[in-house]
């Protein structure tokens, strides 16, 4: 059975903003998001993104005390899903997901995987586009990304 790939909103927003949303599809194929994530994204979804919601609404509400609705719903769905990977960037959300035993990656992990899978030749042009947005990318993090991507 193929691993389920779940995503929070930030990866979709930032990659769409720089014209690279298709990278997620090329790296992972189909992904799953929740209604809350779809509402935060606010744009028409490509056919390779499907919507599924967590069954346990109370658990989602408890998570909302720590993180926003999109992150809470994505984490709650990940808890209910067996063998999944959650794409999430928010530090608080990442820490919470890891505490719950959820495998995670982030936008930069998607970009690195695209490079390591020979989907893209270099992460540098994508990082340059991201730096032109309001997405935070420190010099230290950029160096780590380049190193992991073998650049």
What are these regions (language model features)?
Residues 2-84, 91-94, 100-102, 125, ...:
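Active-site-proximal, substrate-binding regions of enzyme catalytic domains
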């Amino acid at each position: 059975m193929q691993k389920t790939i779940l995503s929070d909103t930030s990866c979709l927003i930032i990659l769409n903003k720089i014209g690279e949303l298709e990278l997620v599809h090329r790296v992972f194929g189909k992904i799953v998001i929740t209604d809350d994530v779809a509402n935060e994204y606010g744009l028409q979804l490509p056919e390779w993104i499907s919507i599924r919601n967590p069954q346990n609404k109370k658990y989602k509400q408890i998570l909302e005390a720590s993180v926003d609705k999109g992150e809470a719903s994505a984490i709650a769905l990940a808890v209910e899903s067996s063998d999944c990977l959650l794409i999430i960037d928010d530090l608080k959300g990442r820490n919470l997901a890891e505490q719950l035993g959820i495998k995670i990656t982030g936008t930069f992990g998607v970009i690195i995987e695209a490079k390591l899978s020979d989907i893209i030749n270099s992460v540098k042009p994508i990082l340059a586009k991201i730096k032109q947005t309001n997405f935070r990318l420190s010099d230290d993090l950029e160096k780590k990304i380049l190193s992991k991507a073998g650049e």
